[in-house]
Protein backbone atom coordinates (compact mmCIF):
# COMPACT_ATOMS: atom_id res chain seq x y z
CA UNK A 1 0.00 0.00 0.00
CA UNK A 2 2.82 2.41 0.95
CA UNK A 3 4.65 1.52 -2.26
CA UNK A 4 1.48 2.20 -4.30
CA UNK A 5 0.99 5.63 -2.66
CA UNK A 6 4.63 6.54 -3.30
CA UNK A 7 4.26 5.44 -6.93
CA UNK A 8 1.12 7.60 -7.39
CA UNK A 9 2.83 10.62 -5.78
CA UNK A 10 5.82 10.12 -8.08
CA UNK A 11 3.52 9.97 -11.09
CA UNK A 12 1.75 13.20 -10.04
CA UNK A 13 5.12 14.91 -9.55
CA UNK A 14 6.30 13.74 -12.96
CA UNK A 15 3.06 14.89 -14.62
CA UNK A 16 3.23 18.31 -13.01
CA UNK A 17 6.88 18.65 -14.07
CA UNK A 18 5.93 17.72 -17.62
CA UNK A 19 3.04 20.21 -17.56
CA UNK A 20 5.31 23.04 -16.44
CA UNK A 21 7.69 22.26 -19.29
CA UNK A 22 4.75 22.23 -21.68
CA UNK A 23 3.43 25.70 -20.93
CA UNK A 24 4.82 29.20 -21.23
CA UNK A 25 3.66 32.10 -19.09
CA UNK A 26 3.62 35.47 -20.82
CA UNK A 27 3.52 38.47 -18.47
CA UNK A 28 2.25 41.76 -19.89
CA UNK A 29 2.91 44.96 -17.93
CA UNK A 30 1.17 48.28 -18.58
CA UNK A 31 3.01 51.21 -17.00
CA UNK A 32 0.46 53.79 -18.16
CA UNK A 33 -2.63 54.81 -16.19
CA UNK A 34 -4.69 54.10 -19.34
CA UNK A 35 -6.41 50.75 -19.83
CA UNK A 36 -5.06 48.86 -22.85
CA UNK A 37 -7.94 46.84 -24.33
CA UNK A 38 -7.48 44.53 -27.31
CA UNK A 39 -3.92 45.70 -27.96
CA UNK A 40 -1.75 43.20 -29.83
CA UNK A 41 1.41 41.81 -28.28
CA UNK A 42 4.05 39.78 -30.07
CA UNK A 43 6.12 36.79 -28.99
CA UNK A 44 8.71 35.33 -31.39
CA UNK A 45 7.60 31.88 -32.53
CA UNK A 46 11.18 30.67 -32.16
CA UNK A 47 11.00 31.40 -28.42
CA UNK A 48 7.69 29.53 -28.14
CA UNK A 49 9.12 26.51 -29.97
CA UNK A 50 12.26 26.52 -27.80
CA UNK A 51 10.37 26.99 -24.54
CA UNK A 52 7.75 24.34 -25.25
CA UNK A 53 10.11 21.99 -27.14
CA UNK A 54 7.54 21.79 -29.92
CA UNK A 55 7.66 19.38 -32.82
CA UNK A 56 7.33 20.89 -36.30
CA UNK A 57 3.72 19.76 -36.61
CA UNK A 58 2.60 20.82 -33.12
CA UNK A 59 -0.19 23.35 -32.64
CA UNK A 60 -0.52 25.83 -29.80
CA UNK A 61 -3.25 27.63 -27.89
CA UNK A 62 -3.12 30.95 -26.06
CA UNK A 63 -5.11 31.10 -22.82
CA UNK A 64 -6.13 34.04 -20.65
CA UNK A 65 -6.03 34.03 -16.85
CA UNK A 66 -9.40 32.23 -16.77
CA UNK A 67 -8.16 29.48 -19.06
CA UNK A 68 -10.22 30.69 -22.03
CA UNK A 69 -8.70 30.54 -25.49
CA UNK A 70 -7.55 33.83 -27.00
CA UNK A 71 -7.37 34.16 -30.80
CA UNK A 72 -3.85 34.41 -32.19
CA UNK A 73 -1.98 34.49 -35.48
CA UNK A 74 1.50 33.49 -36.54
CA UNK A 75 2.71 36.29 -38.81
CA UNK A 76 4.93 36.23 -41.90
CA UNK A 77 7.89 37.31 -39.76
CA UNK A 78 7.33 34.40 -37.36
CA UNK A 79 5.68 36.13 -34.43
CA UNK A 80 2.74 34.91 -32.37
CA UNK A 81 0.41 37.91 -32.08
CA UNK A 82 -2.63 38.00 -29.81
CA UNK A 83 -4.83 40.67 -28.20
CA UNK A 84 -4.45 41.48 -24.52
CA UNK A 85 -6.47 43.56 -22.10
CA UNK A 86 -4.64 45.07 -19.14
CA UNK A 87 -5.77 47.81 -16.79
CA UNK A 88 -3.87 50.99 -16.05
CA UNK A 89 -0.64 50.41 -14.08
CA UNK A 90 -1.40 46.69 -14.06
CA UNK A 91 0.04 43.32 -14.95
CA UNK A 92 -1.75 40.41 -16.61
CA UNK A 93 -0.59 36.92 -17.57
CA UNK A 94 -1.37 34.68 -20.53
CA UNK A 95 -0.37 31.07 -21.14
CA UNK A 96 0.88 29.51 -24.36
CA UNK A 97 0.80 25.72 -24.50
CA UNK A 98 0.37 22.87 -26.99
CA UNK A 99 -3.23 22.33 -28.02
CA UNK A 100 -5.82 22.53 -30.75
CA UNK A 101 -6.93 26.13 -31.34
CA UNK A 102 -10.61 26.93 -31.65
CA UNK A 103 -11.71 28.40 -35.00
CA UNK A 104 -11.16 32.18 -35.11
CA UNK A 105 -13.22 34.68 -37.07
CA UNK A 106 -11.27 36.53 -39.76
CA UNK A 107 -11.25 40.20 -38.73
CA UNK A 108 -8.31 41.78 -40.57
CA UNK A 109 -7.92 40.84 -44.23
CA UNK A 110 -7.42 42.22 -47.71
CA UNK A 111 -7.05 41.50 -51.39
CA UNK A 112 -5.37 42.58 -54.60
CA UNK A 113 -7.94 43.64 -57.22
CA UNK A 114 -6.44 43.54 -60.73
CA UNK A 115 -10.00 43.89 -62.04
CA UNK A 116 -10.18 47.35 -60.39
CA UNK A 117 -7.02 48.90 -61.79
CA UNK A 118 -4.71 47.02 -59.39
CA UNK A 119 -6.19 48.31 -56.13
CA UNK A 120 -4.94 46.72 -52.93
CA UNK A 121 -7.76 47.06 -50.39
CA UNK A 122 -7.86 45.85 -46.80
CA UNK A 123 -9.99 46.17 -43.67
CA UNK A 124 -10.64 45.18 -40.10
CA UNK A 125 -13.71 45.37 -37.85
CA UNK A 126 -13.59 49.19 -37.79
CA UNK A 127 -12.84 50.39 -41.33
CA UNK A 128 -11.24 49.82 -44.71
CA UNK A 129 -8.37 51.29 -46.73
CA UNK A 130 -6.83 51.08 -50.17
CA UNK A 131 -3.69 51.92 -52.11
CA UNK A 132 -3.72 52.56 -55.84
CA UNK A 133 -1.66 50.53 -58.29
CA UNK A 134 0.13 50.58 -61.64
CA UNK A 135 -2.95 50.13 -63.84
CA UNK A 136 -4.46 53.33 -62.43
CA UNK A 137 -1.19 55.17 -63.03
CA UNK A 138 -0.98 53.81 -66.60
CA UNK A 139 -4.38 55.39 -67.31
CA UNK A 140 -3.01 58.76 -66.28
CA UNK A 141 -5.19 59.03 -63.17
CA UNK A 142 -3.47 60.75 -60.28
CA UNK A 143 -4.29 58.95 -57.05
CA UNK A 144 -1.27 59.45 -54.83
CA UNK A 145 -2.60 59.02 -51.29
CA UNK A 146 -4.39 56.36 -49.28
CA UNK A 147 -8.14 56.03 -49.74
CA UNK A 148 -10.67 55.11 -47.03
CA UNK A 149 -13.80 52.99 -46.71
CA UNK A 150 -16.10 53.83 -43.82
CA UNK A 151 -17.77 50.97 -41.96
CA UNK A 152 -20.63 50.54 -39.50
CA UNK A 153 -23.41 48.12 -38.49
CA UNK A 154 -21.05 45.17 -38.92
CA UNK A 155 -17.65 43.94 -37.78
CA UNK A 156 -17.39 41.38 -40.60
CA UNK A 157 -15.35 41.85 -43.79
CA UNK A 158 -17.33 43.75 -46.44
CA UNK A 159 -14.84 44.98 -49.04
CA UNK A 160 -14.88 41.88 -51.21
CA UNK A 161 -18.65 42.06 -51.57
CA UNK A 162 -18.52 45.84 -52.17
CA UNK A 163 -16.00 45.35 -54.96
CA UNK A 164 -17.95 42.43 -56.44
CA UNK A 165 -21.10 44.53 -56.65
CA UNK A 166 -19.31 47.66 -57.92
CA UNK A 167 -17.61 45.66 -60.70
CA UNK A 168 -20.45 43.24 -61.53
CA UNK A 169 -20.05 42.73 -65.31
CA UNK A 170 -23.71 41.91 -66.01
CA UNK A 171 -24.94 44.98 -64.14
CA UNK A 172 -22.26 47.15 -65.75
CA UNK A 173 -23.44 45.97 -69.19
CA UNK A 174 -27.05 46.68 -68.22
CA UNK A 175 -26.13 50.22 -67.10
CA UNK A 176 -24.38 50.87 -70.43
CA UNK A 177 -27.45 49.64 -72.29
CA UNK A 178 -29.88 51.69 -70.16
CA UNK A 179 -27.86 54.88 -70.68
CA UNK A 180 -28.98 54.81 -74.33
CA UNK A 181 -32.67 54.28 -73.61
CA UNK A 182 -33.42 55.21 -69.99
CA UNK A 183 -30.76 57.40 -68.32
CA UNK A 184 -32.75 57.65 -65.08
CA UNK A 185 -32.94 53.85 -64.72
CA UNK A 186 -29.23 53.64 -65.56
CA UNK A 187 -28.44 56.12 -62.80
CA UNK A 188 -30.60 54.22 -60.30
CA UNK A 189 -28.89 50.92 -61.10
CA UNK A 190 -25.48 52.61 -60.90
CA UNK A 191 -26.31 53.94 -57.43
CA UNK A 192 -27.62 50.53 -56.36
CA UNK A 193 -24.25 48.85 -56.99
CA UNK A 194 -21.87 51.71 -56.19
CA UNK A 195 -19.56 51.58 -53.17
CA UNK A 196 -19.69 55.37 -53.22
CA UNK A 197 -23.25 55.02 -51.86
CA UNK A 198 -23.97 53.73 -48.34
CA UNK A 199 -26.09 50.58 -48.52
CA UNK A 200 -26.12 50.06 -44.76
CA UNK A 201 -22.56 48.94 -43.96
CA UNK A 202 -20.32 51.80 -45.11
CA UNK A 203 -18.94 53.40 -48.25
CA UNK A 204 -16.10 55.20 -50.00
CA UNK A 205 -16.88 58.90 -49.55
CA UNK A 206 -13.30 60.14 -49.19
CA UNK A 207 -11.50 62.20 -51.84
CA UNK A 208 -7.82 61.51 -52.54
CA UNK A 209 -6.55 62.74 -55.91
CA UNK A 210 -2.94 63.97 -56.34
CA UNK A 211 -2.44 64.51 -52.59
CA UNK A 212 -1.12 62.59 -49.58
CA UNK A 213 -4.69 61.49 -48.88
CA UNK A 214 -5.25 59.84 -45.51
CA UNK A 215 -1.64 59.64 -44.35
CA UNK A 216 0.95 58.87 -47.02
CA UNK A 217 4.55 59.70 -46.14
CA UNK A 218 6.81 61.60 -48.55
CA UNK A 219 10.30 63.02 -48.66
CA UNK A 220 10.68 66.80 -48.83
CA UNK A 221 13.18 68.94 -50.71
CA UNK A 222 13.14 72.07 -48.59
CA UNK A 223 9.45 72.95 -48.28
CA UNK A 224 8.47 70.98 -51.39
CA UNK A 225 6.77 67.59 -51.02
CA UNK A 226 8.16 64.93 -53.38
CA UNK A 227 4.86 63.17 -54.05
CA UNK A 228 5.01 59.40 -54.57
CA UNK A 229 2.71 57.96 -57.24
CA UNK A 230 0.95 54.58 -57.26
CA UNK A 231 2.77 51.47 -56.06
CA UNK A 232 4.74 49.40 -58.59
CA UNK A 233 4.60 45.95 -56.97
CA UNK A 234 2.57 44.48 -54.13
CA UNK A 235 2.94 41.41 -51.93
CA UNK A 236 0.39 40.42 -49.31
CA UNK A 237 2.37 38.99 -46.39
CA UNK A 238 -0.35 38.41 -43.76
CA UNK A 239 -4.04 37.91 -44.41
CA UNK A 240 -5.78 37.44 -41.09
CA UNK A 241 -7.37 36.47 -38.92
CA UNK A 242 -5.95 39.24 -36.69
CA UNK A 243 -3.42 41.07 -38.86
CA UNK A 244 -3.22 42.09 -42.50
CA UNK A 245 0.20 43.06 -43.89
CA UNK A 246 1.13 44.20 -47.38
CA UNK A 247 4.50 45.21 -48.82
CA UNK A 248 4.41 47.89 -51.52
CA UNK A 249 7.36 48.94 -53.65
CA UNK A 250 7.33 52.11 -55.74
CA UNK A 251 8.90 53.33 -58.96
CA UNK A 252 12.16 55.27 -58.50
CA UNK A 253 11.79 58.87 -57.34
CA UNK A 254 13.88 61.80 -58.46
CA UNK A 255 15.41 63.23 -55.29
CA UNK A 256 17.90 66.10 -55.57
CA UNK A 257 18.94 64.98 -59.03
CA UNK A 258 19.21 61.29 -58.11
CA UNK A 259 16.65 59.31 -60.13
CA UNK A 260 17.11 55.94 -58.42
CA UNK A 261 15.60 56.42 -54.94
CA UNK A 262 13.15 53.55 -54.35
CA UNK A 263 10.51 53.65 -51.62
CA UNK A 264 9.24 50.51 -49.87
CA UNK A 265 6.30 50.44 -47.47
CA UNK A 266 5.19 47.64 -45.17
CA UNK A 267 1.65 48.37 -43.97
CA UNK A 268 -0.09 46.30 -41.30
CA UNK A 269 -3.56 46.60 -39.82
CA UNK A 270 -4.57 44.77 -36.64
CA UNK A 271 -8.03 43.79 -35.50
CA UNK A 272 -9.53 46.40 -33.18
CA UNK A 273 -7.31 49.30 -34.28
CA UNK A 274 -8.32 52.40 -36.22
CA UNK A 275 -4.72 52.88 -37.34
CA UNK A 276 -2.35 51.12 -39.75
CA UNK A 277 1.28 50.66 -38.77
CA UNK A 278 3.50 51.69 -41.68
CA UNK A 279 7.25 51.21 -42.00
CA UNK A 280 8.80 53.25 -44.82
CA UNK A 281 12.34 52.95 -46.18
CA UNK A 282 14.19 54.53 -49.11
CA UNK A 283 17.03 52.72 -50.83
CA UNK A 284 19.82 54.58 -52.66
CA UNK A 285 19.16 57.81 -50.76
CA UNK A 286 22.52 59.50 -50.25
CA UNK A 287 21.82 62.08 -47.53
CA UNK A 288 19.45 62.81 -44.65
CA UNK A 289 16.22 64.53 -45.68
CA UNK A 290 12.97 65.68 -44.10
CA UNK A 291 10.13 63.16 -44.34
CA UNK A 292 6.53 64.16 -43.78
CA UNK A 293 3.25 62.39 -43.14
CA UNK A 294 0.27 64.33 -44.44
CA UNK A 295 -3.51 64.47 -44.23
CA UNK A 296 -5.19 66.28 -47.10
CA UNK A 297 -7.36 69.29 -46.17
CA UNK A 298 -10.63 69.82 -48.01
CA UNK A 299 -11.72 72.89 -46.04
CA UNK A 300 -9.15 75.60 -45.26
CA UNK A 301 -10.77 76.33 -41.89
CA UNK A 302 -11.48 72.69 -41.01
CA UNK A 303 -10.86 71.32 -37.52
CA UNK A 304 -7.16 70.42 -37.29
CA UNK A 305 -4.87 69.30 -34.48
CA UNK A 306 -1.11 69.44 -35.15
CA UNK A 307 0.61 68.37 -31.92
CA UNK A 308 4.31 67.69 -32.49
CA UNK A 309 5.14 67.39 -28.78
CA UNK A 310 2.58 64.67 -28.14
CA UNK A 311 3.11 62.97 -31.50
CA UNK A 312 -0.14 63.14 -33.44
CA UNK A 313 -2.09 65.06 -36.08
CA UNK A 314 -5.82 64.94 -36.86
CA UNK A 315 -8.35 66.43 -39.25
CA UNK A 316 -12.15 66.34 -39.63
CA UNK A 317 -12.84 65.62 -43.30
CA UNK A 318 -16.15 66.83 -44.81
CA UNK A 319 -16.37 63.79 -47.18
CA UNK A 320 -17.26 64.05 -50.85
CA UNK A 321 -20.76 65.31 -49.96
CA UNK A 322 -20.42 68.74 -48.36
CA UNK A 323 -24.13 68.74 -47.42
CA UNK A 324 -23.29 66.53 -44.44
CA UNK A 325 -25.36 63.57 -45.66
CA UNK A 326 -22.32 61.31 -45.40
CA UNK A 327 -21.36 62.60 -41.97
CA UNK A 328 -17.73 63.39 -41.19
CA UNK A 329 -14.59 61.29 -41.46
CA UNK A 330 -11.96 61.67 -38.76
CA UNK A 331 -8.42 61.10 -40.06
CA UNK A 332 -5.19 61.04 -38.11
CA UNK A 333 -1.59 59.92 -37.77
CA UNK A 334 0.47 59.07 -34.67
CA UNK A 335 4.22 58.79 -34.22
CA UNK A 336 6.27 56.63 -31.84
CA UNK A 337 9.38 58.80 -32.33
CA UNK A 338 9.81 62.52 -31.78
CA UNK A 339 8.23 64.74 -34.45
CA UNK A 340 10.32 67.74 -35.46
CA UNK A 341 7.39 69.93 -36.53
CA UNK A 342 3.62 69.65 -37.09
CA UNK A 343 1.75 72.33 -39.01
CA UNK A 344 -0.92 73.21 -41.56
CA UNK A 345 0.36 74.12 -45.02
CA UNK A 346 -2.23 75.73 -47.31
CA UNK A 347 -1.87 75.72 -51.09
CA UNK A 348 -1.83 78.68 -53.45
CA UNK A 349 -4.62 78.96 -56.02
CA UNK A 350 -2.33 77.53 -58.69
CA UNK A 351 -1.27 74.64 -56.45
CA UNK A 352 -4.92 73.91 -55.64
CA UNK A 353 -5.55 73.25 -59.33
CA UNK A 354 -2.52 70.95 -59.47
CA UNK A 355 -3.80 69.09 -56.39
CA UNK A 356 -7.36 68.46 -57.57
CA UNK A 357 -8.88 71.34 -55.61
CA UNK A 358 -7.42 70.35 -52.24
CA UNK A 359 -6.79 73.23 -49.83
CA UNK A 360 -3.55 71.87 -48.36
CA UNK A 361 -2.27 69.35 -45.83
CA UNK A 362 -1.67 69.05 -42.14
CA UNK A 363 1.90 67.77 -41.97
CA UNK A 364 4.05 66.05 -39.36
CA UNK A 365 7.71 66.45 -40.32
CA UNK A 366 10.62 64.30 -39.12
CA UNK A 367 14.16 63.61 -40.32
CA UNK A 368 14.95 60.51 -42.39
CA UNK A 369 18.46 59.06 -42.28
CA UNK A 370 19.64 56.90 -45.21
CA UNK A 371 19.41 53.20 -44.41
CA UNK A 372 16.89 53.70 -41.59
CA UNK A 373 13.17 52.97 -41.27
CA UNK A 374 10.48 55.58 -40.68
CA UNK A 375 7.60 54.14 -38.66
CA UNK A 376 4.26 55.79 -38.07
CA UNK A 377 0.55 54.98 -37.76
CA UNK A 378 -2.35 56.42 -39.77
CA UNK A 379 -6.06 55.77 -40.10
CA UNK A 380 -9.61 56.98 -39.71
CA UNK A 381 -13.01 56.75 -38.03
CA UNK A 382 -16.53 57.76 -39.07
CA UNK A 383 -19.02 59.76 -37.03
CA UNK A 384 -21.83 57.35 -38.03
CA UNK A 385 -19.99 54.55 -36.21
CA UNK A 386 -18.54 54.36 -32.69
CA UNK A 387 -16.48 57.58 -32.54
CA UNK A 388 -19.01 60.39 -32.82
CA UNK A 389 -17.13 63.65 -32.23
CA UNK A 390 -13.82 65.35 -33.02
CA UNK A 391 -13.07 65.46 -29.28
CA UNK A 392 -13.49 61.69 -29.00
CA UNK A 393 -11.22 61.17 -32.02
CA UNK A 394 -8.57 63.52 -30.69
CA UNK A 395 -8.65 61.71 -27.35
CA UNK A 396 -8.23 58.36 -29.13
CA UNK A 397 -5.30 59.70 -31.13
CA UNK A 398 -3.59 61.35 -28.14
CA UNK A 399 -3.88 58.12 -26.12
CA UNK A 400 -2.72 56.03 -29.09
CA UNK A 401 0.41 58.16 -29.39
CA UNK A 402 0.99 57.79 -25.64
CA UNK A 403 0.74 54.01 -25.95
CA UNK A 404 3.19 53.99 -28.87
CA UNK A 405 5.71 55.88 -26.77
CA UNK A 406 5.14 53.65 -23.73
CA UNK A 407 4.68 50.17 -25.20
CA UNK A 408 3.46 47.21 -23.18
CA UNK A 409 6.33 45.24 -21.62
CA UNK A 410 6.19 41.55 -22.53
CA UNK A 411 8.21 38.99 -20.55
CA UNK A 412 8.25 35.18 -20.48
For the regions a protein language model found, what residue spans apply to each?
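Polysaccharide-binding surfaces and accessory modules of carbohydrate-active proteins
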Residues: 21-23, 290-349
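Alpha-mannosidase-like glycoside hydrolase catalytic domains involved in N-glycan trimming
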Residues: 20-111, 116-117, 143-158
Amino acid sequence: RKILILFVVALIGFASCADSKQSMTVTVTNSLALERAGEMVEVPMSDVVAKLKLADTAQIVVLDVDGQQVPYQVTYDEKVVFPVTVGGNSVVTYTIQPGTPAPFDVIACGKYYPERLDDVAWENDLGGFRAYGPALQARGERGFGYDLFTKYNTTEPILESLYAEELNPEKRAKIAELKKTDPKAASELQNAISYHIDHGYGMDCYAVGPTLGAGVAALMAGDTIIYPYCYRTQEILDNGPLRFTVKLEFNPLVVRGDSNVVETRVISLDAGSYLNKTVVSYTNLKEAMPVTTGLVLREPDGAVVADAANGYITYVDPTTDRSGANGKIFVGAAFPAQVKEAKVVLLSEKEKKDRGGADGHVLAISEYEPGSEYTYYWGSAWDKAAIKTPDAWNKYMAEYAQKLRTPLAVAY
